[in-house]
């Protein structure tokens, strides 16, 4: 699909990618998957994503490596951290650094759904504000 909500999934854990794909199935979503920070960076250079779902730790870095770049290149992109350690300090740190949402692993379909709803609402609100400016 090429005209759905553009989403970047950055995950080295197959179970997280499978859960995200299960939730996305049948929705108007154009998803791209990366398992490494360098792959995600290439994707971010070629496309503006509405949402980035990123695991806290990847094979070649962490979500923080991408979050700073997303904020610089595409400040309107919503960034969702998938927290697999379950440590409260990590959760607070991700929010402090600019993530809009933090989902705990194992991912729950309703949590992913809510993150998508928030992204869609945010996109609609930004378009409406731009139209009235």
What are these language model-derived features?
Residues 13-33:
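Two-component/phosphorelay signaling modules centered on CheY-like receiver
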Residues 107-116:
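C-terminal output helix
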């Amino acid at each position: 699909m090429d005209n759905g909500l553009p989403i970047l999934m950055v995950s080295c854990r197959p179970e997280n990618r499978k859960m995200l794909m299960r939730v996305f199935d049948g929705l108007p979503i154009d998803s791209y998957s990366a398992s490494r920070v360098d792959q995600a960076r290439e994707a971010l250079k070629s496309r503006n994503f509405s949402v980035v779902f990123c695991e806290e730790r990847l094979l070649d870095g962490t979500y923080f490596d991408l979050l700073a770049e997303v904020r610089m290149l595409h400040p309107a992109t919503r960034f969702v951290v998938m927290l697999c350690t379950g440590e409260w300090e990590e959760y607070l740190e991700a929010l402090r650094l600019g993530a809009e949402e933090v989902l705990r692993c194992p991912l729950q379909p309703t949590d992913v759904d809510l993150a998508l709803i928030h992204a869609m609402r945010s996109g609609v609100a930004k378009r409406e504000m731009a139209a009235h400016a």
